[in-house]
Amino acid sequence: TEDAPLPDSIFTCPRRSAAAIDSPLEEVRMTGDFGNVSEFMGRHLPFLLAAADKYIKPAIRYQGCAYDSGVDFLLPNRYFTLWSTSDSRIRSTLETFASAGEQLENLAISEEDLRGYILSAYAQALPPSGMLNGRMRFLRRRLFGISTDHINKMIMDIRNSSLKDQRTAAKLIHKIL
């Protein structure tokens, strides 16, 4: 009711959590919250996608039993998600997710590969635009206290990604997970 405010504690989530439900979908997710890791920048996002392409998907989908897997990020909420679907090997999937940062450090990534991951990061970071979409997005961000400046800095920094950033990205992703 309006007279009994909800305690803030119901809105907090544990740092690490996982849930497994016996269903046909069997979706597994691990979320990395980079909101409190100031060193994590837009230039590190393409390396998340490289880890998904060169480590997570081969380990979970092709060698495991999952239907699909990947990595998504949501800049306004400052987190990324490693996910798999129709995955019955929950324990090994979570172990694979947890080691993504360590594995990324030694992945072979060419300049050409990195350019593709940079484009993919832009595609995921830039929401649809239009006359109403932009205004509604601004209002939602303002309402929820989301910094448009921070999001724009992350997006602008994607293009600064270089192979020199791979080791730092790996260490930060490992720290976040």
Region locations from a protein language model:
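M16 family metallopeptidases and their MPP-like homologs
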Residues: 1, 26-48, 53-163, 177
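An aromatic/glycine/proline-enriched structural segment found at the starts
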Residues: 1-26
